[in-house]
């Protein structure tokens, strides 16, 4: 069974150290959660079959707990914990002894059994610099001055109005002045923790999507879906949160007016790739970070999910930062180095960060922006429109990636030159 190295995707900088390209800050070591698993059921099962399967699991688990073999494992297990249903994909998490896991792997209703994983956040530090990313999004990929705050960002004034961006992350400070009351608390999967953002990552990502100053879609609504806290998470919480998002979008009739942002990445983990794919088939668009390993994104989740919009990071002069993943599964490139946005610590706090965590929300914001001004009835239509607007062949060292830079479709762009 495959171990997972998984984390949020911002990189630290020392204040004032702007010239060197950064090395990626790797997330902490990823460990299997002892005795805890994600079970994926085969497609086509009826509700009755799923109910019968769960009864069977409970019976087998109880019997094994009573046996010497289960007791000898030294792991307390609690059986089925949570069920996830995304389109026609059914999964559940659970705490099981080794004998029950063996029985599950042989069950005719079970597609796969994967160990749950600890998921670690990358640490970041603050740097007060840069607003180049927004100007780049409306400049057809023309190089922009890194330190200038005088670059125009041109956009349609609908600016994401009526669209909902769901941010699966560390939470959002919904009271930050950048959100102007357009940010709401959605779901908090972390037990015994308040629905706040003590780490800063989720607030930062949301600011790039929809902040009044730093956002691509300045009138979009953002929904906080908390699956991480200040330390780590597991797929038990990530799948719960993603399942909630898909249900909320569906129940609220927002499929063609909603986008999910996942600024997270780790070693390939098929159950979550499957979940993202099923959301696409259900009519929901997901934008994901390519990852910060400086390697081919095909080995990362959720970047390898075939119908997610996978985003690599580009610098202001159209080069690929050394940290950004690449490859044939990277659909598009967007600003991802020295990007300023909202931060933790106060309702007007800001920070400048780098990583594909910053690139992904630029494209999620672009999706929200386009949804507000055009009739894009499906994720396929959204992806086609986003890619159709891109500017080709600009990124240096794109490796074998599709060489397409994000662009919002506005033709005019001006520089205000200082006197």
UniProtKB/Swiss-Prot annotation:
Residues 1-16 form the signal peptide. Glycans are attached at residues 248, 261, 348, 388. It is an enzyme of class 3 (hydrolase). The keyword Protease applies. GO terms for molecular function: serine-type endopeptidase activity. GO terms for biological process: proteolysis. Its main location: secreted. Residues 17-122 form a propeptide. The keyword Secreted applies. The active site is at residues 169, 201, 357. Keywords: Glycoprotein, Hydrolase, Protease, Secreted, Serine protease, Signal, Virulence, Zymogen. InterPro entries: PCSK9_ProteinaseK-like, Peptidase_S8/S53_dom, Peptidase_S8/S53_dom_sf, Peptidase_S8_Asp-AS, Peptidase_S8_His-AS, Peptidase_S8_Ser-AS, Peptidase_S8_subtilisin-like, Peptidase_S8_subtilisin-rel. Residues 131-419 form the Peptidase S8 domain. Secreted subtilisin-like serine protease with keratinolytic activity that contributes to pathogenicity. This is Subtilisin-like protease 2. It comes from Trichophyton verrucosum.
């Amino acid at each position: 069974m495959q171990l997972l190295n998984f984390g949020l995707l911002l990189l630290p900088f020392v204040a004032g150290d702007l010239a060197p390209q950064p090395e990626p800050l790797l997330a902490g070591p990823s460990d299997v959660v002892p005795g805890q698993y994600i079970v994926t059921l085969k497609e086509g099962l009826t509700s009755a079959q799923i109910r019968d399967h769960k009864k069977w699991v409970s019976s087998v688990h109880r019997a094994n707990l009573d046996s010497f073999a289960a007791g000898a494992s030294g792991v307390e297990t609690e059986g089925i914990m949570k069920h996830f249903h995304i389109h026609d994909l059914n999964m559940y998490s659970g705490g099981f002894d080794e004998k029950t896991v063996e029985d599950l792997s042989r069950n005719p209703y079970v597609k796969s059994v994967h160990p749950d994983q600890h998921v670690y956040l990358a640490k970041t530090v603050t740097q007060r610099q840069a607003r180049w990313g927004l100007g780049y999004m409306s400049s057809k990929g023309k190089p922009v001055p890194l330190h200038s705050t005088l670059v125009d960002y041109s956009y349609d004034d609908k600016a994401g109005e009526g669209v909902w961006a769901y941010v699966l992350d560390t939470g959002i400070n919904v009271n930050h002045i950048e959100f102007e009351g357009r940010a709401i608390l959605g779901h908090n999967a972390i037990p015994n923790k308040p629905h706040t953002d003590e780490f800063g990552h989720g607030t930062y990502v949301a600011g790039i999507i929809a902040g009044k100053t730093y956002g691509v879609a300045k009138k979009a609504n953002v929904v906080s879906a908390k699956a991480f806290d200040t330390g780590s998470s597991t797929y038990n919480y990530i799948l719960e949160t993603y399942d909630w998002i898909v249900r909320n979008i569906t129940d609220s009739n927002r499929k063609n007016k909603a986008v999910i942002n996942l600024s997270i990445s780790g070693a390939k983990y098929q159950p979550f790739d499957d979940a993202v794919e099923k959301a696409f088939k259900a009519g929901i668009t997901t934008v994901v970070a390519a990852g910060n390993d400086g390697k081919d994104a095909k080995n990362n989740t959720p970047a390898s999910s075939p119908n997610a919009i996978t985003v690599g990071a580009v610098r202001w002069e159209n080069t690929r930062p050394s940290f950004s993943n690449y490859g044939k599964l990277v659909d598009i490139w967007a600003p991802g180095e020295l990007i300023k946005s909202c931060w933790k610590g106060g309702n007007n706090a800001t920070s400048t960060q780098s990583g594909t965590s910053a690139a992904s929300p630029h494209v999620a914001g672009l999706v929200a922006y386009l949804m507000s001004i055009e009739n894009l009835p499906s994720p396929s239509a959204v992806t086609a429109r986003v890619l159709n607007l891109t500017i080709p062949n600009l990124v240096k060292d794109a490796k074998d990636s599709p060489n397409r830079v994000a662009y919002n479709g506005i033709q005019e762009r001006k520089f205000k030159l200082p006197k």
